[in-house]
Amino acid sequence: MLFPKDTLTREIKDLSGIWRFKADPDNRGREEKWHHQPLQDTIPMPVPASYNDITQDAALRDHIGDVWYEQTFIVPRSWSGDRMMLWIGSACHHAVVWVNGVEVASHKGGFLPFEADITRVAVPGRENRVTIVVNNVLNWQTLPPGRIKTFDDEKHPEGYRVQEYFHDFFNYAGLHRPVKLYRTSGLFIQDITITTDVQGESGVVGYSIECSQPEGEVRVKLLDEDGKEAATGKGSSGTLQVENARLWKPLQAYLYTLHVELLDSYGQLADHYQLQVGIRTVKVEGTRFLINGERFYFKGFGKHEDSDIRGKGLDQAVNVKDFNLLKWINANSFRTSHYPYAEELLELADREGIVVIGEVPAVGFTFFNYNDKVYTPDQANEETLAHHHDVLSDLIARDKNHPSVVMWSLANEAATFQDEAVPYFRQLADTARRLDPQRPITIVQWPLPDKCKVAQFFDVICVNRYYSWYQDPGALELVEHQVEWELTNWYRNFGKPVIMTEYGADAIAGFHQDPPVMFTEEYQEELLTRYHNVFDRLDFVIGEHVWAFADFATKQGITRINGNKKGVFTRQRQPKAAARMLRSRWGEMGEYPEKL
């Protein structure tokens, strides 16, 4: 699916803004067919945004079930006779869409876009109405999974229920990304796939163009950043040779622009689309992660799409601030933990040269013990696996052309120690390699190395571990021994490079004590430093992603003090002591650390 943008032939109408909104706590709206008429008794709701923190109503913040959105729009008369599409960037986690009372789309999965052809139902030159019902319920067939617990005892009101989930971030919901209309002609470009290679001083850009109909002529043109022509081609697939190519490099991004033109049988321009292309290669070789044949060391974070008021709603000001902080702290990468982020953010990563590990929203596939089964007929089952395949396929289809994305992560902290995990993740690994043979794949591990049964299917070992926090809390003197023991065993067992994708400690900004104690800024800084002492001794360690970039919202609980405080920045993006330590460490490290 191509990201909607204005081109020589395409036109965009952004429906972002204030929508009419109504919660449906009794889930009556579908049965009563609220979509057949304008919604009644609504409140204003911004789109894009999570709805949870917009009002002062705790019931809406913690709502379980359907909510309804409505907006009106006018299709320009100039669009008459054209193909009209409605694109929804994100709807967490299930959605049904109606235009003028007619169902045009339904979608499962909260972090990737979907679209609907509304040509037959939208009327140019008059007001039209779009209605979207969004449901936030998580179960074992969603990504991430969850379950509804209904209480049946005298201590709770009849029918009282809660949404349980097994991941550590708040279940924000709503229309998190923009909603857009766009038009094309009846003959249009459906998809573009780009591959790149480097041969000596030349860059090689492979392209494959999928069109709506076989007739029509395809022409492509690659321009450099000065707008000068670098290469041209004809046909729906081919290869462009770029002499003296400028490569896309970490923190030194160079982007070409590919223009694709589709001509009709009369030689007239029917459709045009352009996208940015970064020429680069990615390869895992032994214990080295290579970008353009040069060793790369991951310095950065696990992040979240999370900020005050808007929750997981797209906010370009927050995104730009975050990228400025990444550069300030001398980071070069992040993981889209634990779901696909907005494509607007990936475009920013492309421009800024920030390296990205793209992750599927498969988080919460464990009960954090070695006894309780996850892969059972009534939990993670064949329906779950089918949805996992669908989401993985959609993620690769959306992000395959982003040079910043160098690796796919197929899950976070899954129960990879269970026998049933072997066929489950073998199939997913096969799907990822078939859809994108150019990128390495990984899975982020929770079990210890002698327990994992699936690491052999992946190219890089990614490990999350919280020594002296969840294990042996407060015992900083154990960190180096335990980290070195575990990472060495991962390498000994599987012979693959290792990235520490999560490590850290909660720190409440302004809490201080010396000697360090838990929850102080000093403790967070000291714990990270002791991890780093180990990384610097191990040749097979190729990266360090601190958990987390910034504090973020979670469900309420006795282990969370108004959210997770493991960020080295506060939720308002102010640095803690650990941020300045990391800035110094990563700045002195250069592109690749000298191992001791």
UniProtKB/Swiss-Prot annotation:
A cellular component term, taken from the record's GO annotations: cytoplasm
Catalytic activity: a beta-D-glucuronoside + H2O = D-glucuronate + an alcohol
Residues that coordinate or bind D-glucuronate: D168, N412, N464, Y470, E502, W547, K566
Protein name: Beta-glucuronidase
General function of this protein: Displays beta-glucuronidase activity with the artificial substrate p-nitrophenyl-beta-D-glucuronide (PNPG). Is probably involved in the metabolism of oligosaccharides containing the 3-O-beta-D-glucopyranosyl-beta-D-glucuronide structure released from bacterial and plant acidic carbohydrates.
Keyword Hydrolase tagged: yes
Keyword Hydrolase annotated: yes
Domain of life the protein comes from: Bacteria
Cystine crosslinks: none
Species: Paenibacillus borealis
GO molecular function, one term: beta-galactosidase activity
Enzyme class: hydrolase
One Pfam short name: Glyco_hydro_2_N
Keyword field: Cytoplasm, Glycosidase, Hydrolase
Domain free text: The N-K motif seems to be a discriminant that could be employed as a fingerprint to identify beta-glucuronidases from the large GH2 family of proteins.
pH dependence: Optimum pH is 5.9. Shows high activity in a broad pH range of 5.9 to 7.7.
EC number: 3.2.1.31
UniProt-annotated catalytic positions: E413, E502
